[in-house]
Design a protein with these regions (language model features):
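Hydrophobic alpha-helical segments with transmembrane-like composition
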Residues: 103-107, 115-178, 197-211
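C-terminal "closing" transmembrane helix and its immediate cytosolic amphipathic cap
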Residues: 150, 290-303, 319-378
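Membrane-interface helix-boundary motifs at transmembrane edges
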Residues: 5-9, 70-82, 146-156, 218-233, ...
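Transmembrane alpha-helical segments and their boundary/interface "anchor" motifs
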Residues: 47-55, 69-102, 114-128, 139, ...
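Interfacial loop-to-helix transition and helix-capping segments at the boundaries
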Residues: 44-54, 121-135, 176-209, 245-282
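Alpha-helical transmembrane segments and terminal signal-anchor/GPI-anchor hydrophobic tails
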Residues: 222-301, 308
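Functionally critical transmembrane alpha-helices in membrane proteins and complexes, commonly lining
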Residues: 10-69, 88-96, 126, 200
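Aromatic-anchored segments of alpha-helical transmembrane domains
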Residues: 21-28, 162-174, 239-252, 317-318
Length: 378
């Protein structure tokens, strides 16, 4: 792939950091919902305000792949897959094996039968956060298609793709007939697994946000000008999109009688308002972190979080597991203050783990290669 050296975009690193923070929030929120009477506002913080977190990772992944590139330049698909395999496939397999072994011991469930491993790996079911990497691998496998589309991409075509995306995601998430068909399939059949776990590997759920990241990367000078001229409007878009998703969440609970769990399973990132929020949050955060820069304490903090976000994303369930064991071992319920404290502890513990492992990896390069796909520069 031909490329020209472009200036580093610090906002992307910061977005990685805040996205990782959002993912931790979602997973702490899932545990907090075990509380028989959860605070619906804290649930909104953990599980609604963070809904941009997974889709925006696909945005920045595409941005990183296409920034400074030309989609019409010569492209070695083989070399691309080798590089991406080192960066994603190897860590995915390593962490999947780690969690299968760890959980077999920690939860006493035993190691799964060997015949079930292909299915576990295909669907990203070794641990709850790993499905993201499966979808990312599929995006990589289809890279020639994305390059072809981006070489011909226009804003009107991108708008059409957005409309198709909204329609497809709505069908996948909310179509009653389709979902009844899936749940009616016999347990243990391949077709049921392929459809039941569709959110774990169907790239079609996130094509628009991925292409948006690639399109902005290819037209970054124009996008940077737009951010400079319309920063306030981009902030407003982010706020309005969040307010709309929150309003729907509160309506579901306070008016329609949904439980908090039902509310977050409805007002999610694949709903029309969820997609609107993902777009609004993406553009607003890009503008915010571009303006924030790296010459202040907050900016530097997000750069550090972004630098270690990959390891934290992969490792944070370990911290959650043992913090929960401590909480339950002392006969405490996950109340709002404890949940917030647990969130901060998870973030700080995994940040420390990431820093230590990165340092060890500088002495033993294989550590970084296996855990985060980082090759030591000579």
């Amino acid at each position: 792939m031909s490329s020209s050296k472009r200036a580093r975009v610090s906002a992307v690193e910061a977005i990685r950091g805040i996205s990782m923070m959002g993912v931790i929030g979602i997973h702490i929120g899932a545990e907090y919902l075990a509380n028989p009477s959860p605070n619906i506002h804290l649930v909104a913080l953990f599980d609604i305000g963070t809904r941009f977190s997974v889709p925006i990772f696909f945005f920045i992944s595409a941005f990183g792949l296409l920034y400074g590139q030309s989609p019409t330049a010569p492209f070695s698909y083989r070399d691309f897959l080798v590089r991406r395999g080192r960066a994603v496939v190897i860590p995915y397999l390593v962490w999947s094996l780690f969690y299968l072994i760890h959980d077999a011991y920690a939860y006493g469930v035993g190691f799964p039968p060997l015949v079930s491993l292909p299915g576990i790996l295909f669907f990203g079911n070794a641990k709850y956060q790993l499905y993201f990497m499966v979808i990312l691998i599929w995006f990589y496998l289809l890279m020639p298609l994305w390059r072809m589309l981006l070489a011909r991409m226009t804003l009107p075509l991108l708008a059409v793709i957005l409309l198709v995306q909204i329609g497809f995601d709505y069908w996948s998430s909310f179509d009653t007939a389709f979902n009844l068909y899936v749940y009616g399939l016999p347990e243990g059949t391949l077709l049921r697994a392929l459809l039941f776990y569709r959110l774990n590997y169907w790239v079609m759920h996130y094509v628009f946000i991925f292409l948006l990241g690639g399109y902005i990367a290819l037209h970054f000078d124009a996008f940077r000008t737009l951010m400079a001229r319309h920063t306030t409007r981009l902030y407003a878009l982010g706020i309005v999109s969040l307010a709309a998703l929150l309003a729907w969440y509160y309506k579901l609970i306070l008016v329609d009688g949904y439980t908090p769990l039902e509310g977050i399973y409805t007002a999610h990132q694949l709903s029309p308002l969820g997609i609107f929020y993902t777009i609004g949050a993406t553009l607003a955060l890009f503008a915010f972190f571009t303006r924030l820069g790296t010459e202040n304490a907050l900016g530097r903090a997000f750069q550090v979080l972004g630098k270690h976000s990959y390891f934290i994303y992969l490792a944070h369930p370990v911290a959650i597991t043992y913090l929960l064991m401590m909480i339950h071992g002392t006969a405490h319920v996950l109340t709002a203050p404890i949940a917030l404290t647990m969130y901060m502890a998870t973030l700080l513990l995994t940040l420390c783990m990431a820093t230590v492992m990165r340092k060890i990896g500088e002495c033993v390069p294989m550590i970084n290669e296996l855990t985060i796909g980082a090759k030591t520069k000579k």
